[in-house]
């Protein structure tokens, strides 16, 4: 299966460091110790580009540190579902994060 470059962009004011951890090896294989740090590109936007298998559904969470203690939360502190993406050429996945657990 061919690979394609996917950009994950996170918009948040809730953290100075942002990581993604997900279902593929390129996103840490659900091990937060291997979570991928995003680069801060503006005051509230973080971004990373990764090669992923085209057409394979990928799940991920956003973290404010390399621990599940730092996982993203909803606006009221509630748990949220995993983000899903299906890599395709030129895909830019934009996620807004209101809060983190810590």
Question: What are these regions, as identified by a protein language model?
Answer:
Residues 56-60:
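Exposed beta-strand face motif in extracellular beta-rich ectodomains
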